[in-house]
Amino acid sequence: MNLKYYQVDAFTSEQFKGNPAGVIFSDISDTVLMQKIAFENNLSETAFISKIDNEFYIRWFTPYCEVDLCGHATLASAFIFFNYIDSNKDIFIANSKSGELRVIKNSSMYYLDFPIDELNEYKNMKLIEEVFNEKPEAVLMGRHDILAIFNNENIIKNLKPNFSLMCDIDVRGFIASAES
């Protein structure tokens, strides 16, 4: 099998800086094969972009699993698209498990448009107060993360989270925020 593989350093214009990602434009649809390639690449993510009926589809793999969304590998894929696939375009659109993603090229700048994560009120305020050892003003739940909003940035600076309790809650992560 012959594949054209690119490695791109996202978020930088300097070689060996930024966040590296593997990029493969191919019609591979075999999930097991994509996982094996990502494992061998051993980068935080490898993006696989296929074209079906004039639309691009993107999937991302860490060395160990497929992920639903990856910003830097999407930017890396757009860079390859603009520079090696179709240099006449200034927008790269790809469908993913997280929805439609767009990268817009304006001169040497790239703008990434990700789907909005819908936030809903999180009902168990007491639990989040225990997690942060501080009472938040509001708590919202996104697709994978809990967002706790506090009164001011000094509260954020002095938070003493209960990391053991965090690990017991089935979410990807916690975000503490305040107006600064």
What are the language-model segments listed below?
Residues 1-69, 73-180:
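Active-site proximal loop and beta-alpha junction motif in alpha/beta enzyme cores
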